[in-house]
Regions:
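Short, glycine- and charge-enriched coil/turn segments that flank and shape catalytic ligand pockets
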Residues: 14-18, 105-107, 216, 236-237
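Short active-site-proximal "capping" loops at secondary-structure junctions
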Residues: 1, 28-31, 251
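Active-site-proximal beta-alpha core segment in soluble small-molecule metabolic enzymes
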Residues: 18-199, 208, 264
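C-terminal active-site-proximal or functional interface alpha/beta core segments in diverse enzymes
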Residues: 168-269
C-alpha cells in the first residue's frame, strides 16, 4: 500500500514541476485504517457520503485535503461539508442550487470544484466509462459558460478548481493526454468569467492487472502522460501551473491482497 502511494508521489515530483496532491479514491477501500495510512503518506481523500467523510476525518485526513463527490448529495451531507470546510465537487445544477441555498442559510463560504464531461471516449466497460458526453456524471462541456456565469453571481460559493474523470480500468494513455489540453482550455474559459482556477483534478482510472492478458501502464507512465499534457498546455497559454490532483483507488489497494470466496452452489445454464 505504501509503495503504491509513494510511486504516485515520486512520479508527480519527477514529472510535474508545479504543486500536486494525489487524492485516494476511498470507494476502493473505505476504512479508518486506510484513511490513516494515506494521510500519513501525504495524500488527500475523496468521499461520496457522510459516512466516508466521517471515516476520513476519524482516520486523520485533514479537512482541507478532502473532496466531496457525488451526483445526488443530500442536504444533510452538504451541510456537513460546509460546516467542516470540506471542498465540494459540484456535479449538476441541482447540486449547485442546494449548495447555494444551504451556504446562504449558514452565511458560510464554501470552495468548490466543477466536474464536467470532456467528451473523451476510452476502451473500457460502458458502466465505468464516465468521460463521454452522455455520462450521468458532471456538466456537459457545452454548458460550462452558463454555469460559470451563474457561479460568479453567488454570494458564498468560490470556484477554485475543475474535475474530470474519463473512466475506470483504462489501459490507454492517449485519453489522458487529451484530457490535460481540454482541462486547460476550460481554465481559460472560466477565467473569462472572473474565476481563478488554481486546481486541476484529472480523476483516476489507471487499470490494474486482473488477467494474464491485461497489460496496464505503470503508475510512472500514467503520471508522466497526465503531467506533461498539463504542463505543455499551460506553457502554450502562458498560465501558471495549477495544483495537479489525481484520484487513484484500485491501483493503490489492488496488489495488497486477494479476496477468496467459498463456492456454495452451482447453476447449470
Amino acid at each position: 500500500l505504501r509503495n503504491s502511494c509513494r510511486a504516485y508521489k515520486k512520479a508527480l515530483e519527477k514529472y510535474y514541476p508545479g504543486p500536486s496532491l494525489p487524492i485516494y479514491a476511498s470507494k476502493a477501500n473505505s476504512s479508518i485504517f486506510m484513511s490513516n495510512l494515506i494521510a500519513s503518506e501525504g495524500f488527500g481523500l475523496d468521499a461520496v457520503s457522510e459516512g466516508e467523510l466521517l471515516t476520513a476525518l476519524k482516520g486523520g485526513v485533514p479537512n482541507e485535503k478532502i473532496v466531496f463527490h457525488g451526483n445526488n448529495k443530500s442536504d444533510k451531507e452538504i451541510e456537513f461539508a460546509i460546516k467542516n470546510n470540506i471542498k465540494v465537487i459540484v456535479d449538476n445544477d441541482h447540486d449547485l442550487k442546494r449548495l447555494e441555498e444551504i451556504s446562504n442559510s449558514f452565511n458560510h463560504d464554501i470552495e468548490i470544484m466543477v466536474r464536467f464531461t470532456p467528451g473523451i471516449e476510452c476502451h473500457t466497460h460502458e458502466y465505468i466509462r464516465t468521460g463521454s458526453f452522455d455520462s450521468k456524471f458532471g456538466f456537459g462541456i457545452e454548458s460550462l459558460g452558463r454555469l460559470f456565469e451563474v457561479i460568479s453571481k453567488t454570494k458564498h460559493i468560490k470556484l477554485t478548481g475543475l474535475h474530470a474523470h474519463i473512466g475506470s480500468q483504462i489501459f490507454e494513455l492517449d485519453p489522458h493526454n487529451d484530457l490535460g489540453k481540454i482541462m486547460v482550455d476550460v481554465i481559460l474559459q472560466a477565467k473569462d468569467f472572473g474565476h481563478n482556477i488554481k486546481e486541476l483534478n484529472v480523476g483516476g482510472g489507471l487499470g490494474i492487472k486482473y488477467t494474464e492478458e491485461d497489460d496496464p501502464p505503470s503508475i510512472d507512465e500514467w503520471i508522466k502522460t497526465v503531467s506533461l499534457s498539463v504542463v505543455k498546455a499551460c506553457d502554450k497559454n502562458n498560465l501558471n501551473l495549477p495544483i495537479l490532483m489525481c484520484e487513484p483507488g484500485r491501483s493503490i489497494v489492488s496488489t495488497a491482497g486477494v479476496t477468496i470466496y467459498k463456492i456454495g452452489s452451482f447453476k447449470e445454464v
